[in-house]
Regions:
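Transmembrane alpha-helices and adjacent helix-loop boundaries
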Residues: 1-337
Length: 337
C-alpha cells in the first residue's frame, strides 16, 4: 500500500495506455457523429439511458469500489438532483442549468452531513444505514406539500424548443448530446480521480483502514470525501432525467430500485475499475429496453430474470466482473516515456 502511495506521488496523472487513448478517442468521435446518420428515436433513447446509467454507476463506484463502502440508498442523491432543478424552475423560473449546479452542491452538503453520522459504521451496518436514509428521503418527499407530495412535480412546458429551459419537443438529438457531454465529463473526472493521490488514498482506506491510518491518512475524512464526490456525481443525472421525462415523483426518483440497479450494473461490469460500470451498463441497459419492446410494459419481469442469471454466472465464474476478462496489461497505464 505504501508503494501505491509513492507511485501516486511520482507518476503523472496524464500517463495512460496510448492504445486505450486512441480507441476511446475514436469511440467518442463516433458517438458525436451518431445522430448525423438519422438514427431513429428509440436508439437515441437507448444511448441516452446508457449515458445516464453509466454516469450513475461511476458515482456508486466511487463510494463502493474506491473507498469500500456499500451504499444501498444512493438513489436519494438522484432524487435530490431531480427535485432541485425542477422546483427552482417551477417556482422561480431559474434555468435548469443553474438548477443542476444547485443540486450538485446540495447533494454534496447532504452527503457530508450524512457521512459525519453514518460513515463511522462499516460493512453491513453502513449498508443498512444508507438503505434507511434512502427510504426516509422517499417518505419525506411523499408527504412534503411544498414539492407536490406524492403527486410530484410537472415541469412547465415551453411552446418551442428551448436550450435555456432544456426542453426539446421536436427531436431527442439535443438530449442525446447533453447526456453524452455530461457522461464524458463524469468519466473524465473519475479517470482523473482514479489516478490522483486522493484516489490512491481512497483505495488504501478500502484495502486496510488501520494501515492507512498508520501512514497518516485520515480514514473518516477520506470516506466522507468519497461519499460527497459520489453524491455530487449522481445529482446532475437526476436533474437531466427530470428535464428528459418532464415529470417526477418520489416513487420514481427516490426509488430503491435505482440504488439496486446501479449496484447491479457496477457489480456486473466490475467494482473498483472505472471501466466496469460502463461495461455493465452497455450490456444490461439494452436487455432492459428490448425486453420492454418484446414483452410489453415493464418487460414482464423477464429483464429481472436475465439480470439474475447473468449475475449468478458472473459471481461464480468472474467475481471481479466482466471487465476481468480483459487482460490487465491492456488496462494498465503505459509507463513508457
Amino acid at each position: 500500500m505504501n508503494s501505491k502511495l509513492e507511485i501516486a506521488k511520482l507518476e503523472p496523472v496524464w500517463n495512460t495506455n496510448k492504445s486505450i487513448f486512441y480507441l476511446m478517442s475514436s469511440i467518442v468521435f463516433l458517438l458525436f457523429a451518431l445522430p448525423l446518420f438519422n438514427v431513429n428515436s428509440f436508439y437515441l433513447h437507448l444511448m441516452i439511458t446508457i449515458f445516464m446509467y453509466s454516469a450513475m454507476s461511476q458515482s456508486w463506484n466511487v463510494i463502493a469500489g474506491m473507498s469500500g463502502q456499500i451504499s444501498l440508498g444512493h438513489g436519494a442523491f438522484f432524487g435530490l438532483g431531480a427535485y432541485s432543478s425542477t422546483f427552482l424552475y417551477m417556482e422561480y423560473d431559474i434555468t435548469p442549468w443553474a438548477g443542476i449546479v444547485v443540486g450538485i452542491f446540495l447533494s454534496g452538503i447532504v452527503a457530508i452531513l450524512i457521512g459525519l453520522s453514518v460513515l463511522r459504521l462499516s460493512g453491513h451496518y453502513f449498508a443498512i444505514a444508507t438503505l434507511l436514509i434512502g427510504i426516509s428521503f422517499q417518505v419525506i418527499f411523499q408527504r412534503w406539500d411544498l414539492v407536490g407530495a406524492a403527486s410530484g412535480l410537472w415541469v412547465p412546458l415551453t411552446e418551442f424548443d428551448s436550450w435555456n429551459a432544456m426542453q426539446f419537443h421536436s427531436s431527442k438529438v439535443p438530449y442525446y448530446y447533453i447526456f453524452l457531454v455530461f457522461f464524458l465529463i463524469t468519466f473524465f473526472l473519475i479517470w482523473l480521480l482514479d489516478r490522483s493521490k486522493i484516489g490512491f488514498r481512497f483505495r488504501a482506506v478500502r484495502d486496510d483502514p488501520q494501515a492507512a491510518a498508520s501512514l497518516g491518512i485520515n480514514v473518516s475524512k477520506h470516506k466522507i470525501i468519497a461519499y460527497a464526490i459520489s453524491a455530487m456525481i449522481m445529482a446532475p443525472m437526476g436533474s437531466l432525467f427530470a428535464q428528459y421525462i418532464l415529470i417526477i415523483d418520489p416513487d420514481r426518483v427516490f426509488s430503491f430500485d435505482i440504488s439496486i440497479f446501479v449496484l447491479l450494473l457496477t457489480v456486473l461490469g466490475g467494482v473498483g475499475n472505472i471501466w466496469g460500470p460502463l461495461v455493465g451498463t452497455v450490456i444490461l441497459i439494452p436487455v432492459t429496453e428490448y425486453s420492454r419492446i418484446w414483452f410489453g410494459g415493464t418487460g414482464g419481469a423477464v429483464d429481472l430474470m436475465i439480470y439474475g442469471i447473468i449475475l449468478m454466472i458472473i459471481c461464480v465464474f468472474r467475481p471481479a466482473g466482466i471487465i476481468s476478462l480483459v487482460p490487465a496489461r491492456i488496462l494498465e497505464r503505459d509507463k513508457k516515456r
